[in-house]
Amino acid sequence: MTPHINAPEGAFADVVLMPGDPLRAKYIAETFLENAKEVTNVRNMLGYTGTYKGRPVSVMGHGMGIPSCSIYTKELITEYGVKKIIRVGSCGAVRNDVKVRDVIIGLGACTDSKVNRIRFKDNDFAAIADFDMTQAAVQAAKAKGINYRVGNLFSADLFYTPDVEMFDVMEKYGILGVEMEAAGIYGVAAEFGAKALSICTVSDHIRTGEQTSSEERQLTFNDMIEIALESVLLGDQA
């Protein structure tokens, strides 16, 4: 057990899918996993372990923002032996060619957070996904006929940012989605010798104002979940 996870030793599979919302973790476990059992519930940050097509897989919420997700990913890796983390979350779009409900595979993650600079002795850290996991996710998306984009995310510290001009900079640099966790998760994975990938669904468009409801975000973003789970199976074959 840890201060934030009350699961016993061995409760987690070596691969954990991590949405921000613990209720989405519950939905994934109940909808996609067989024989799923709740293994942790501290602060109602729910975690489950079951199987997907016979393969052990866990799913657990990580909360909002880099500080929260860094706590959970670090403890899963160092205390429970987790080898791979797949974030399955939502993001906002700033580019006109990126649409609501598009699936984005996060090859890298820029950030305005200083967390990785603290880790990396005040130097810039290239927060990138694991190549094999990225490749497996692309293969899974192609096999299922799911439209996807591959590219950079931006992990922001502020949800309600006053710096709206930064959206123009993000668009110029080709940022596909704005969220709050990927750069932190990639940093934690690198620091502790694990692998990570973020797969996000566009939940709202910052330019147009189009958005999905909280219920839709919790219950209908199935494409990214299927990509993540199928990529786990493909990764086992590599």
From Swiss-Prot:
It holds the Pfam family PNP_UDP_1. It catalyses: a purine D-ribonucleoside + phosphate = a purine nucleobase + alpha-D-ribose 1-phosphate; a purine 2'-deoxy-D-ribonucleoside + phosphate = a purine nucleobase + 2-deoxy-alpha-D-ribose 1-phosphate. The record marks 217 as: Important for catalytic activity. A purine D-ribonucleoside binds at residues 4, 179-181, 203-204. It comes from the Bacteria. The keyword Transferase applies. The active site is at 204 (proton donor). PROSITE patterns: PNP_UDP_1. Phosphate binds at residues 20, 24, 43, 87-90. Keywords: Glycosyltransferase, Transferase. InterPro entries: DeoD-type, Nucleoside_phosphorylase_CS, Nucleoside_phosphorylase_d, Nucleoside_phosphorylase_sf. One of its GO terms (molecular function) is purine-nucleoside phosphorylase activity. It is an enzyme of class 2 (transferase). One of its GO terms (cellular component) is cytosol. Its EC number is 2.4.2.1. SUPFAM superfamilies: Purine and uridine phosphorylases. Catalyzes the reversible phosphorolytic breakdown of the N-glycosidic bond in the beta-(deoxy)ribonucleoside molecules, with the formation of the corresponding free purine bases and pentose-1-phosphate. Belongs to the PNP/UDP phosphorylase family. HAMAP family: Pur_nucleosid_phosp (MF_01627). This is Purine nucleoside phosphorylase DeoD-type. The gene is deoD.
